[in-house]
Regions:
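Electropositive polyanion-binding surfaces
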Residues: 1-363
Length: 363
């Protein structure tokens, strides 16, 4: 079973706490700070599934055959007591040695294969995680989402959202769905991290959309999709829980389709603003870090060679930059070439960074 903490058990609609969460819409994760949608004291204790403590949950129970294909499912209210908590690294160790984790991993791989057959665009882009402590010390770590444990959790969360959307569609439960238009057939993404391929293909990407009508999600390769797996940090997930519980308990729905459309209009604007702020803050702190490296040389990968400039990405920082081209560069460098650049100027508050190309990397 996939068990999601049931925040709606603790918070009634239109209470002061609910109104504040609705206004915030989402938790915000910045390098220097985290702004919770709910108070930290509640989000990390009463609302969370904690070890050895009984907590209400909304559970998606999946029944599979001996080949790990899903036969049927059930969505129900439960009370869960977590027996053990595992880090991603620990789960990576257990996969291949522990029969229960092997079964879970095999189920998740079968789900991944099914999505791929449904047209899912699976691609890998590592993420640079930037954290800033109280002394403004900047730490950077490359976050690998393609480990077996990360793929396992990701597939199970996608499955829970997919199944929930199908359940709501079949029972005409008014909820917020997410969909994504079909990508151009000429879009061919690499299964492994390839910055040149990603740069060339991203023009075909289309933004996911929220609505009250269940439509195909081409990016994930599923017939319909919603989000209900993070009610602590996404208000719209909390809405889905309330609607499903109303159906299960044969009670009137808390939200009409018209109210859901109003919530979508507001929340999409907030989420766009939050995403922009998050990107800008990450870039600011990355430039602040690189400012200490003025005069240093770093490796970069050429993405495109144009008549007036060369576009490249700093290899260890995933920062896309460009510099003025010259006759020598125009003939010399091709997409995928590894080059060395020198950091010349960095002004974080003005979002300025200037580099110069030294030559081909010796790596």
């Amino acid at each position: 079973g996939i068990h999601i903490t049931d925040v709606s058990h603790h918070i009634a609609p239109d209470t002061a706490l609910d109104q504040e969460a609705k206004e915030r819409c989402t938790s915000v994760y910045l390098p220097e700070n985290k702004i919770n949608m709910f108070p930290h004291e509640l989000a990390n204790s009463l609302f969370s599934l904690r070890k050895d403590e009984l907590r209400p949950a909304l559970s998606v129970i999946i029944d599979t055959d001996n080949r790990y294909n899903m036969k049927n499912y059930e969505i129900k209210e439960t009370f869960i007591k977590v027996k053990d908590r595992f880090t991603y690294d620990k789960v990576d160790e257990l996969i291949g040695h522990d029969s229960d984790f092997n079964i879970l991993y095999n189920i998740s791989e079968k789900m991944r294969e099914k999505r791929k057959a449904g047209g899912a665009k699976l691609f890998y882009t590592p993420e640079l995680e930037i954290t800033v402590d109280e002394n403004k010390e900047i730490t950077m770590k490359i976050y690998d989402r393609e480990t077996p444990s990360h793929k396992l959790v990701s597939e199970l969360m996608i499955a829970a959202n997919d199944i929930t959307a199908s359940f709501c569609k079949a029972n005409a439960i008014p909820i917020i769905y997410r969909s994504q238009p079909a990508l151009d057939d000429s879009c061919v993404l690499s299964d492994t991290y390839d910055p040149v391929n990603f740069y060339q293909q991203r023009k075909y990407f289309k933004k996911s959309e929220a609505g009250i009508v269940p439509l195909y999600h081409y990016g994930l390769g599923v017939d319909c999709y919603t989000q209900m797996t993070s009610p602590i940090r996404r208000y719209n997930d909390l809405i889905i829980h309330r609607q499903i519980k109303s159906f299960l308990n044969k009670k009137p729905y808390f939200y009409t389709n018209r109210e859901l459309e109003e919530i979508i209009m507001y929340s999409e604007q907030i989420l766009d603003s939050v995403n922009m702020i998050t990107r800008n803050r990450k870039r600011y702190w990355l430039l602040t870090y690189l400012k200490k490296m003025i005069g240093s040389s770093v490796d970069a990968i050429v993405l495109q060679n144009l008549s007036d400039r060369i576009i490249f990405i700093l290899k260890d920082y995933f920062l896309e930059l460009n510099c003025t081209n010259s006759t020598n560069y125009e003939k010399k460098y091709s997409p995928g070439d590894l080059i060395t650049v020198r950091i010349e100027t960095v002004i974080p508050r003005e979002d300025i960074i200037k580099v110069s190309i030294i030559g081909e990397s010796e790596e």
